[in-house]
Regions:
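N-terminal module of bacterial RNA polymerase sigma factors
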Residues: 1-30, 34
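Amphipathic alpha-helical segments enriched in hydrophobic/aromatic and basic residues
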Residues: 13, 25-29, 39, 54, ...
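Acidic, proline/glycine-rich intrinsically disordered inter-domain spacer in sigma factors
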Residues: 92, 96, 104-111
Length: 111
């Protein structure tokens, strides 16, 4: 049995940050990926984008583990997902804005 299954979030964070233990990250991922995916999917309705967003949040957690001062793990992860979803909306809103005038110009018959 995996010893990390019984760990609290605070214990996992300690092992992640201070011990640099990848098994702690793996346990955090197993514990929360489904909830985070569902949170993203509720807003985006796109499987691949949501999987990518969740993966990015966990990669960021690992890469920046020493820089972050995380007190409460799950609320931190939820906030990170919301931010990534917001950024996805922001990034994708720009495209239709610039494409729309071109479609209008193209649809005008030549004179």
């Amino acid at each position: 049995m995996d010893a990390f299954v019984e760990c609290t979030d605070k214990q996992l964070l300690y092992r992640l940050v201070h011990d640099e233990d990848e098994r702690a990250l793996d346990q955090i991922y197993k514990r929360y990926w489904r909830q985070l995916y569902n949170q993203a999917f509720k807003r985006l309705k796109h499987q691949e984008l949501c999987e990518e967003i969740v993966q990015d949040v966990f990669v960021d957690l690992w890469v920046n583990r020493k820089k972050r001062n995380i007190e409460h793990l799950y609320p931190y992860l939820q906030t990170a997902i919301r931010y990534q979803v917001f950024m996805m909306y922001h990034k994708n809103k720009k495209l239709p804005y610039f494409e729309q005038p071109l479609e209008h110009i193209i649809s005008i018959p030549p004179q």
